[in-house]
Amino acid sequence: NLSNGDTVTVTAVYDDYLTETYGCIPESDTKTYTVEGLDSYMTSFDGLPDGALDEVHTDSRDRVESLIANKEQICGAFIDWSTDTPDTYQVDTQNLKLYTSYLLVSKGADFGAKYSNRYIAVYHTTGSMSKKSWFGDSYNGDMYIAVDYKDLKFDESGNLIVNLTDAEYTYFTTADNAYNYWMTSNKDCYKVFEQKAVAPAAAPAADAATADTAPAEASAS
C-alpha cells in the first residue's frame, strides 16, 4: 500500500566470511528510496488541476441528456418503475445544469467500502409527465439525476483516469434526498466531500427548450 512520496529503506545483510574472502565492504548497510511513478486515487476536491473533471462532466451531461430523451426510462424512474410509454412528457433541457458533485473516499476495506472512491455528478432540471398506472399517474416538479463513477485516479503525469464505461444512475425528487442517499448513508465506510456547482435552475419559461411530448427516488448499487 505504498503511495508516491513514501520512503522505503533497504538494509543489506551480508556474511563476514564473504567480506574477508573477497575484500568487498559496502559503503553503507542501508539505502532509502522515494516511491514515485505510481497511479494515485483521487482523495479530495482540493488541489485538482484546472479542467481535471471536464471529461467526466462532458460524459455525465451527455448521459443525462440521453436519459431524458428516453422518456420511458425517466418516466418509470419518477412515477412507477415501469417502462410503459407516458401519455404526456415534458422535461426542461435548456435549464439542465450540474447542481453538485459528491466524492466518496474509502476508509478502507475493513469498513466495507467496495471502491477506493466514487465520484457522483448530480444534475438538476424540472419536468412533468403522466401515464396510466396502478402505482401513480403523474409527476410535476424537480428532477435530480446522479451519475456515479468509480475508482478515479491520477497517473504519473497528473492526468485523471476514469472508466467512463462503468457509470450508474440514481434519480431523486429533492436535493436533500440525493444528499442523504449518497453522503449521509455512506459515512460508515467512506469519507464524504461535496463540491457545490450552481443553484437549481428556475422553473422553465413558456418558450424554454424541452424534451418533446408530454420524478420518486431510484437506487443503484
Pin down the residues of each PLM region.
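Serine/threonine-rich, repeat-prone extracellular segments and beta-strand-based repeat modules
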Residues: 1-11, 101-114
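Beta-rich interaction/scaffold domains
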Residues: 1-66
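Short, non-transmembrane alpha-helical segments in secretory-pathway proteins
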Residues: 46-92
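Short, cysteine-centered beta-strand-loop-beta hairpins and adjacent loop/turn segments enriched
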Residues: 13-27, 126-144, 154-155
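Ser/Thr/Gly/Pro-rich low-complexity, disordered linker/stalk segments of secreted
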Residues: 201-221
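Short, hydrophobic/proline-enriched secondary-structure or compact coil segments at domain edges
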Residues: 115-127
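Intrinsically disordered, low-complexity regulatory regions
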Residues: 86-91, 99, 106, 112, ...
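A short, surface-exposed interaction/processing loop segment used at functional sites
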Residues: 136-188, 198
